[in-house]
Amino acid sequence: MTVLNRVVTGGGADPCYCEVDATGQYVFLAHYHGGAVAVVPIRDDGSVGEPTQVVKHEGSGPDPERQEESHPHSVRPGPENRFVYVADLGTDEFYRYAFDAERGRLQLADGAPLTLPPGAGPRHFDFHPLTDHIYLLNELNSTLSVVDADGGTI
């Protein structure tokens, strides 16, 4: 194995999750203590460039020890690569961003963020392979939420 390069992720402390988009041109990063999501381009040789965008989340939740600020815990592009989703444990919100793959930019989508019950603590999620359902695991209240993303709105 060989390290091709490295870049500063730009989103603050404790990057905790990364995932590559369907085209292989971008990697998305969640920064737990930075309260941010970053979009990083992937070059033709597989190395990475400087972030094209860093989106900062604001807010907090009712748990003073775990939700004192935004804590994006996971970030994933949707199955069609049109949207990027973010579970924010600190704010009890599930974000959806429209993704511009040509420019490597995110824009908050209509109907987002989805606010979950106070103290839920959304952490990880996955997409159903045949429907528009998203299964969202909430760490702090030990629940599983099913989100219907049908029709372009949450």
Model segments located where?
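Structural signal for beta-propeller blades
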Residues: 1, 35-38, 92-94, 142-144
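Short loop/turn segments immediately following beta-strands, especially the blade-tip
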Residues: 1, 39-49, 97-106, 147-154
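Beta-propeller fold detector
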Residues: 2-8, 49-59, 106-114
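A generic, well-ordered mixed alpha/beta core segment in the N-terminal half of proteins
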Residues: 4-54
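Beta-rich, blade/repeat-based domains predominating
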Residues: 10-22, 26, 58-82, 116-134
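Conserved beta-strand positions in repeat-built beta-propeller and related beta-rich domains
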Residues: 29-32, 78, 86-89, 128, ...
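Short loop/turn segments immediately following the C-termini of beta-strands
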Residues: 32-34, 42, 89-90, 99, ...
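Acidic, glycine-rich loop-and-beta core segments that form the ion-binding/anion-interacting portion
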Residues: 109-154
